[in-house]
A protein has these predicted regions:
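N-terminal nucleotide/polyanion-binding subdomain common to many enzyme families
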Residues: 15-26
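Soluble catalytic domains of membrane acyltransferases
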Residues: 29-173
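Eukaryotic N-terminal low-complexity, Ser/Thr- and Lys/Arg-rich leader segments
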Residues: 1-17
Length: 173
């Protein structure tokens, strides 16, 4: 399980700040629809007290999609552990060496192994975090999808396991 603490908080804040700068300097305009409702849900103290987590799902076309999403969120969300996302990352893509492993573990990312099924420690950790009211973000297609169509590939079984086995049914965004 990725360690929490000062190093983890520092890495998450650093990536969020760099992503925000990249979006500000590298994009003419960034528009996020529905972010106010998402932030309200994420910061709702009653939701967290009830142990009702959030599963957010997104398609992605590059490995930059996940960290760049952080740059669109308010800075205040990165001050508390309960409002910072946990994520799953493919072993063969982002955990290629010890430095990457150290960095991504401290960036609140669990290592999943393609082809090894839905009963992996990373999925177990995600279910536990959902039961504690945490936010878990996943890319349910299980790979980068370079298709120009808006059609999603099939979701993986792990998505169902997260939702069905969480102690309290999580919000799904």
């Amino acid at each position: 399980m990725p360690p929490a603490g000062t190093a983890s908080s520092s890495i998450v804040r650093l990536v969020a700040a760099l992503s925000r700068q990249f979006l500000a300097l590298g994009c003419r305009r960034v528009r996020v629809l529905g972010s106010d409702a998402f932030v309200r849900l994420l910061t709702d103290p009653q939701r967290a007290a009830e142990g009702r987590g959030i599963v957010s799902l997104a398609n992605h076309i590059s490995v930059l999609d996940e960290p760049l999403m952080w740059g669109t969120l308010p800075r205040s969300l990165f001050q508390q552990e309960r409002t910072v996302r946990w994520s799953l990352g493919a072993s063969d893509i982002i955990f290629k060496n010890e430095l990457c492993r150290w960095f991504f573990h401290r960036g609140q990312t669990w290592e999943v192994f393609r082809g090894q099924g839905i009963y992996q420690p990373a999925i177990n950790h995600a279910i536990t975090r959902l039961g504690a009211g945490s936010w878990v973000h996943i890319f349910p297609e299980g790979r980068v999808n370079l298709s120009r169509s808006t059609r999603l590939r099939r979701f993986k079984w792990g998505v169902s396991r997260l939702i069905l086995e969480a102690p309290t049914t999580p919000y799904v965004v």
